[in-house]
């Protein structure tokens, strides 16, 4: 779908909205007038008024809209909203309103969290989403509830606090829906020990920097990939290094992402718990064995239940379980049954993801038929009803590009069990110091900006460039 800008260069703001509203139409930026399908976003800047117009033609039908904004009120955010709202109104002549209205970003809760922190009531924050951004009442309510959990989690933070993420970029196999840069253990098992050697060097160096800077670690998250592809002995070595080199005495949450149930056994779960971890994530994605096989996950629903019971026996304070709505071969009835089985286990947290068709994933090639957007909407609505009935509330929420139906991912929790790292990371509430291959450190600057530092993506690159990684950590901590 062609996109022509006239009188402005806010391409990103308009492009992201076009991708969200017309995900099935390939994006084609142009600089010259055209005929046929496409969109034109125009802005005329006068002495007193800014006038935005949008005209969208698709399959022989055309939608048009025009809006104005006083020049005196036209700061950068207001101008972008003007362009997006004008484009949105033109698009609504051609399609049904989406659940998230004109919002195209991945963190819609930032708007409502800011509103609550500024003293607005939950009702006023909901109204902001509905009236300014055309968000549906249902999504507005979810957003505000997640923001209320964010405000509560913020009360645990102190100025010197940071969170630490440790990445293990290895998996047993690659799932069909995943684009994460991880290495299959079947092919790269020889890299595990050298990778741990390099990672422990980064851990030790980071511990020195944390002490020198006076920073304290509030939450610690070991993710991946699948960290539990490591053996029990390797997990003990990693976690002992963390305990030795980094002061963990002021942690309020320690999570390990077990992920694939087929990588979990009693020995690993007991080892992880004995090293101080209190929160375990076990992610079936579905409890339908046929769907599991279709997406390349080599485990069964029975293995998920067994891993959960082993985690309970090991004494974890909280267990999270993930499900994905929209997997190939799934349908609303099957998804509801997966959730029923998960709720019967009674985990403290349930995260309901919406399938995102990521460009690096096997599913992106389109070789498998996926549930319709209407089916995904039914899955999510049914999940919300079941989770609320079971006593869960939303505690964090985010969106991704190319999601089925342009919906969202939501973390649900029982009272008092919100996953704090997830909130702090997703809401960018404080600096996240990240270690390992593919990890990204985010430093929150005093002026509100974020400075990002990327580690090499692939394990072999990480090993070869570990000295550069340590030097980059020095640069990051100079900003803290």
Predicted segments with their positions:
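Short, glycine- and charge-enriched coil/turn segments that flank and shape catalytic ligand pockets
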Residues: 61-63, 68-75, 119-124, 209-215, ...
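Canonical Radical SAM [4Fe-4S] cluster-binding loop centered on the CxxxCxxC motif
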Residues: 161-196
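N-terminal [4Fe-4S]-dependent radical SAM core
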Residues: 90-97, 117-164, 213
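A C-terminal junction/extension of Radical SAM enzymes
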Residues: 29-39, 360-435
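Short beta-strand motif preference
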Residues: 52-54, 166, 280-282
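Conserved non-cysteine loop/helix-boundary elements of the Radical SAM core domain that shape
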Residues: 182-383
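Beta-strand scaffold of nucleotide-dependent catalytic cores
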Residues: 167, 281, 349-353, 423, ...
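Radical SAM enzyme core and accessory elements
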Residues: 1-120, 199, 415-480
């Amino acid at each position: 779908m062609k996109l022509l800008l006239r009188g402005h260069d806010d391409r990103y703001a308009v492009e992201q909205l076009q991708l969200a509203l017309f995900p099935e139409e390939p994006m084609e930026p142009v600089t010259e007038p055209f005929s046929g399908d496409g969109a034109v976003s125009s802005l005329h800047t006068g002495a007193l008024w800014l006038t935005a117009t949008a005209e969208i033609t698709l399959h022989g039908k055309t939608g048009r809209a025009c809006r104005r904004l006083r020049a005196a009120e036209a700061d950068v955010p207001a101008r972008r909203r003007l362009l997006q709202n004008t484009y949105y109104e033109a698009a609504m002549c051609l399609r049904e309103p989406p659940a998230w209205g004109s919002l195209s970003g991945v963190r819609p809760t930032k708007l409502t969290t800011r509103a609550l922190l500024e003293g607005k009531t939950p009702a006023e924050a909901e109204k902001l989403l509905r009236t300014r951004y055309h968000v549906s009442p249902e999504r507005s309510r979810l957003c505000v509830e997640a923001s209320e959990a964010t405000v509560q989690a913020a009360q645990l933070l102190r100025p010197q606090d940071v969170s630490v993420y440790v990445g293990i970029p290895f998996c047993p196999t690659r799932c069909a829906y995943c684009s994460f840069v991880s290495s299959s253990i079947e092919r790269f098992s020889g890299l595990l020990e050298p990778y741990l050697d390099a990672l422990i060097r980064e851990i030790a160096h980071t511990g020195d920097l944390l002490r020198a800077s006076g920073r304290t670690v509030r939450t610690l998250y070991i993710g991946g990939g699948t960290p539990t592809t490591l053996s029990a002995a390797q997990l003990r070595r990693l976690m002992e290094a963390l305990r030795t080199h980094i002061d963990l005495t002021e942690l309020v949450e320690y999570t390990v992402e077990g992920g694939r149930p087929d990588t979990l056994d009693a020995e690993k779960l007991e080892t992880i718990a004995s090293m101080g971890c209190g929160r375990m994530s076990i992610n079936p994605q579905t409890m339908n064995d046929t769907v599991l096989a279709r997406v390349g996950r080599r485990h069964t629903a029975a293995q998920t239940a067994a891993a959960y019971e082993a985690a309970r026996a090991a004494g974890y304070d909280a267990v999270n379980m993930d499900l994905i709505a929209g997997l190939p071969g799934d349908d609303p009835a099957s998804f509801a049954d997966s959730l029923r089985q998960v709720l019967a286990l009674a985990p403290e947290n349930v995260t309901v993801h919406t399938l995102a068709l990521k460009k690096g994933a096997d599913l992106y090639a389109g070789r498998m038929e996926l549930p319709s957007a209407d089916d995904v909407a039914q899955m999510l609505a049914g999940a919300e009803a079941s989770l609320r009935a079971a006593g869960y509330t939303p505690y964090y929420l985010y969106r991704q590009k190319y999601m089925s139906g342009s919906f969202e991912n939501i973390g649900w929790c029982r009272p008092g069990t919100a996953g704090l790292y997830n909130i702090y990371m997703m809401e960018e509430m404080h600096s996240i110091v990240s270690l390992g291959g593919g990890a990204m450190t985010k430093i929150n600057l005093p002026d509100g900006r974020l400075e990002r530092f990327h580690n090499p993506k692939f394990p072999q690159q990480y090993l070869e460039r570990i000295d550069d990684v340590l030097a980059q950590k020095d640069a990051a901590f100079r900003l803290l």
